[in-house]
C-alpha cells in the first residue's frame, strides 16, 4: 500500500516544470504583437501581464522495484504575474528591429492531488502549494516584413510543499533554469488578414532539494526536459473607433518530449514519465489605445491528446507602455 503523501511528493518536480513553461509563455502572450513594438532608444518601453489557468493532469509514475503504477493526479490552479523592461530598442534602416530587456515573474500553483494509494484507485489524498520567483532576459529580432525570432533565458527559485489530508507533509525548495527560442513568419493577405506559422522550443533543468517527512527521506533527482510547440495564428489588422486593433485566433500543438525523473523514498525510486501532447485553442485581441499605451489579452482552452483526462482553461491579459 502506498502512503497518501507519496503522490504529492512525486509530482512536485513535474509541476515545477509546468510553472516554468507558463512563466516563459509565448512571444504574443508577453508582448502582444509585433506591431506594438514601435519604440526605440534606451529604456524605450515596459510591459506587464497577468496569466492564469485551471487544470487537471495525470502522470505515469511507477515504483521501479514493484512495477506498481501510482498514477498521481493534480486538480487546481496556476497563476502568475510578469513585468519586463526593454533596455534597448534598435530600429534599423531596413525596417527591422532588435529589442533586449529584463523581466521578473512570480508564479504559483495550488490544488488537490491524488493517486493509487491506500488500496484505492485515483483517491484524492492531499494538497500542494508551490511558488516560484523568476528573473530573466530576452532578445527579440523582428524582420522588415514582420517575421520574428524571440529568445529567453530564465532562472527561478522555488518554495512550497505538499501534505496529505492526515496532516503529514514536507516542504519543497529548489531552482530551475530555462531557455526558450521561438520564431514566426507572417503571410499577409490583401484583405488585412495575416496567417502566421510559429514554432517554439523550451529546455528546462529542474533541481529540487532533498527533504524528509516524519517517516522517510525524499531524494529528488535533478533532470532536464524539452517542450516544443507548433502553432498557427490568424489575425486581422483593423480599427475600432479609430483605435488600431488586432483580433486573433490561434491553435497550438504542445509536446513534452520523452523524459523522466526519479524521486526516491529511503532508496526506493519512483520514476515519473513526462512525455505528453496537448492541443490548445486561443482567441483574443491587441489594441493600441494611444501613442504610448497598448493592451492585449486572450482566452485559452487545452486538452490532452494522450490517454487520460488532462485539460485546462485560462487567460492572459497584458499592458505595454511606451516611454
Regions found by a protein language model. Name each.
Residues 2-44:
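Outer-membrane beta-barrel biogenesis signature
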Residues 5, 10-11, 40-323:
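Membrane translocator/pore-forming domains, dominated by Gram-negative outer-membrane beta-barrels
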Amino acid at each position: 500500500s502506498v502512503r497518501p503523501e507519496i503522490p504529492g511528493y512525486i509530482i512536485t518536480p513535474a509541476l515545477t516544470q509546468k510553472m516554468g513553461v507558463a512563466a516563459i509563455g509565448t512571444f504574443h502572450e508577453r508582448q502582444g504583437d509585433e506591431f506594438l513594438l514601435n519604440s526605440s532608444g534606451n529604456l524605450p518601453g515596459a510591459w506587464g501581464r497577468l496569466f492564469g489557468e485551471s487544470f487537471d493532469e495525470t502522470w505515469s509514475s511507477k515504483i521501479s522495484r514493484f512495477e506498481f503504477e501510482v498514477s498521481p493526479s493534480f486538480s487546481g490552479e496556476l497563476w502568475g504575474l510578469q513585468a519586463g523592461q526593454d533596455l534597448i530598442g534598435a530600429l534599423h534602416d531596413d525596417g527591422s528591429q532588435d529589442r533586449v530587456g529584463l523581466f521578473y515573474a512570480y508564479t504559483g500553483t495550488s490544488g488537490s492531488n491524488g493517486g493509487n494509494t491506500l488500496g484505492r484507485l485515483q483517491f484524492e489524498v492531499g494538497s500542494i502549494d508551490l511558488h516560484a520567483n523568476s528573473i530573466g532576459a530576452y532578445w527579440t529580432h523582428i524582420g522588415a516584413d514582420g517575421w520574428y525570432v524571440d529568445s529567453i533565458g530564465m532562472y527561478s527559485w522555488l518554495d512550497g510543499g505538499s501534505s496529505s489530508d492526515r496532516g503529514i507533509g514536507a516542504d519543497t525548495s529548489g531552482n530551475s533554469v530555462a531557455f526558450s527560442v521561438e520564431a514566426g513568419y507572417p503571410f499577409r493577405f490583401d484583405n488585412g488578414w495575416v496567417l502566421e506559422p510559429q514554432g517554439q522550443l523550451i529546455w528546462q533543468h529542474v533541481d529540487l532539494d532533498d527533504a524528509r517527512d516524519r517517516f522517510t527521506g525524499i531524494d529528488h533527482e535533478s533532470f532536464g526536459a524539452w517542450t516544443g510547440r507548433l502553432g498557427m495564428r490568424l489575425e486581422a489588422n483593423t480599427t475600432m473607433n479609430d483605435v488600431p486593433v488586432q483580433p486573433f485566433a490561434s491553435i497550438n500543438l504542445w509536446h513534452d518530449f520523452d523524459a523522466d525523473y526519479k524521486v526516491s523514498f529511503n532508496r526506493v525510486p519512483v520514476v515519473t514519465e513526462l512525455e505528453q501532447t496537448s492541443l490548445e485553442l486561443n482567441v483574443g485581441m491587441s489594441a493600441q489605445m494611444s501613442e504610448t499605451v497598448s493592451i492585449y489579452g486572450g482566452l485559452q482552452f487545452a486538452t490532452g491528446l494522450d490517454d487520460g483526462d488532462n485539460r485546462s482553461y485560462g487567460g492572459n491579459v497584458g499592458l505595454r507602455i511606451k516611454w
